[in-house]
C-alpha cells in the first residue's frame, strides 16, 4: 500500500492511523543508463595441431524505460513558476502533444466542453480534460485539451498519447494552453483537489532533462496536512459537474 493510499484510507474512513517515524514512500524509479560495452574476450583451445579461436563479442547493457518523462512533445513549450489562486501550472505551446508523464491508468476523460462564460462554473472551466493516476499513486490532470487520444480505463506507459494542447473551457477566453495539476486521488468526483495541490515546475524541469524526480513524497506530505480536502471538495455545490 502506497503512502498516499494509506493516508487516503485514514482520511476517508475517519479511523486513527498511528504513524511510525517518517519514511519516504517507496517509489519505483529507473535511472537512465548509458549503454556500456562488455570487455572483449578471446579464447583459444588447442587439440593436437588444431587451434580454434572464438571471435570477440560485445554486449550492450540494458537501458530501462524511464519512470518519468516530460509530458509535452512536438512543440517548444514554456511555463511559469506559479498559478493564480492555487498550486498548478499553465503550459503554453499550442498544438503540442500531451503524453503520459509516467505509467498508470486513465481515470477520467471529458470530451465535451460545457463551460459557459456567463456562468463561469469552475467545475467546467477545464473543458476537454484527461486525468490519470500513476502507478506511483499520484494523480495527474491535463485540462483545456483540443483532441483527446485516450479513453477511461486505458493503461498507459510513459510517453503514451493523451491528447493535444488546445483552447477549450475557459481557455477560449485566453491563450491556447494546457493546465497541468498534480494531486492525490479522491474517492469521489470533485474538481478542487484535482486541479492541483503542489507546484509542478520543478518536476517538469527535471523530466525535461531526463531526471527521475518523483512527486510522491511531496504529494503525501501535502495530503497529510490537508486530510479533509477530498471530503470538503465532494460536498461543494458544483462537484457533480466536475
Go through each PLM region and give its residues.
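Bacterial N-terminal signal peptides that target proteins for export
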Residues: 1-6
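C-terminal motif of bacterial Sec signal peptides marking the signal peptidase cleavage site
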Residues: 14-16
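Surface-exposed, glycine-biased beta-strand/turn segments
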Residues: 19, 32, 47-129, 158, ...
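Bacterial Sec signal peptide processing site at the extreme N-terminus
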Residues: 19-29
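Short histidine-centered loop motifs in beta-beta connectors
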Residues: 92-94, 99, 133-160
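Short glycine/proline-centered loop/turn elements that form peptide/ligand docking sites
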Residues: 149-150, 161, 167-176
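A short hydrophobic beta-strand segment most commonly corresponding to one strand
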Residues: 177-189
